[in-house]
Amino acid sequence: SAPNLGTPTLPSPGFRRTKMGDVEIISVLDGIARRPLGEEFVKNAPLAEVKALLTSQGLPTDYIDVPFTPFVVIAGGRKVLIDTGLGEFGGPNAGKLLENLRAAGVPASDIDTVLISHFHGDHINGLRNKAGELAFAKAKVMVPAAEYAFWMDDAKMAAAPAGQKGAFENARCTFSAMGPDMLVQFAAGAEVVPGIRSVAAYGHTPGHTLFEVTSAGQSFFYLADLTNVPSLFARNPDWAVTFDMDAEAARKVRREVFARVTSSKSLVGGFHFPFPAFG
């Protein structure tokens, strides 16, 4: 039987605001998954080495807590949500995004644009509930064209390993009923809304995309899944998490972006960073 790893405590309140120039950025927690730490989590490092790094930071070694934190950007009258969490599909410790948005004063009905970094379930499942209804009914949903092309490609789905078929089905189910008036694809590097530019960071998935928010000469980088939990992967950028589809491309872009945000002293936010997920 699986060991009882306990349940992570969800922070309260589940949102954190910061101002940058004329922009307000709010991290809004969807939940935290506690997963047993096994050999497979870091694909290219022995478990003993992974555990030693956790121990050196005073962190537990039998499990890993993976938070899910979408971000809201309020700029120029726009209310933009970046990624959506697991919604009703993530068990009792997830699906808190809608209540935390309300608590932060930005109910789902106020969101006019949803930006999606990539199509893994913890980023897109919050778009709909189990009945299939849209959580952000008034919003345009903007997705990377390269990501959309990959997951909607029947040949890619047919060739995918068995463990990946479900992700293809999930992506298709999530986006299938969205018409062209709602679902918008954007090219790599496009300015998706005024003041927010997309940054291609392919590797974790074939169309994995970051977003850079600029205001008054300052920048905030939403790093999506460039690095999973930073206690492991920010300290060892060459380590590959089990979820990286192209580990070498992910490693390369991780090092490039880390160098960029370090030299520019940008504020960063990471979907799987410890809450409040700013860095």
What name fits each language-model region?
Residues 96-99, 125-135:
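Metal-dependent catalytic neighborhoods of phosphoester/phosphodiester hydrolases
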Residues 30-31, 84-87, 119, 146-147, ...:
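Active-site metal-binding loops of divalent metal-dependent hydrolases
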Residues 1-106, 110-122, 137-200, 217-225, ...:
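Metallo-beta-lactamase
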Residues 214-279:
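Cap/insert and terminal regions of metallo-dependent hydrolase folds
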Residues 197-211:
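Active-site glycine- and acidic-residue-rich loops that bind
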Residues 52-64, 105, 165-168, 241-254:
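A short acidic, glycine-rich active-site loop
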